[in-house]
């Protein structure tokens, strides 16, 4: 997910996307710990997506 895509979304949409990504991160961590995760790059990708969403949320909050 690109930052430009996130900038176009509303705060409510960003919060919903953040919850979705946090759930995905939890599931990936559980799969990794049990040895079921084959695509380990998804953990890093999800973590960075969460950081991007949080950054955009903070930027939007600072402009208000």
From Swiss-Prot:
Domain of life: Bacteria
The protein's name: Large ribosomal subunit protein uL29
Family: Belongs to the universal ribosomal protein uL29 family.
Annotated signal sequence range: none
CDD domains: Ribosomal_L29_HIP
GO biological process assignments: translation
Keywords of the record: Ribonucleoprotein, Ribosomal protein
Pfam families according to UniProt: Ribosomal_L29 (PF00831)
CC per GO annotation: cytosolic large ribosomal subunit
Matches recorded under InterPro entries: Ribosomal_protein_uL29 (IPR050063), Ribosomal_uL29 (IPR001854), Ribosomal_uL29_CS (IPR018254), Ribosomal_uL29_sf (IPR036049)
A GO term for molecular function: structural constituent of ribosome
Entries under NCBIfam families matching the protein: L29
């Amino acid at each position: 997910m690109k930052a430009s895509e996130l900038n176009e979304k509303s705060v409510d949409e960003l919060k919903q996307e953040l919850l979705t990504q946090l759930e995905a991160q939890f599931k990936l961590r559980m799969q990794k710990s049990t040895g079921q995760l084959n695509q380990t790059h998804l953990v890093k990708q999800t973590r960075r997506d969460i950081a991007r969403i949080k950054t955009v949320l903070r930027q939007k909050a600072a402009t208000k």
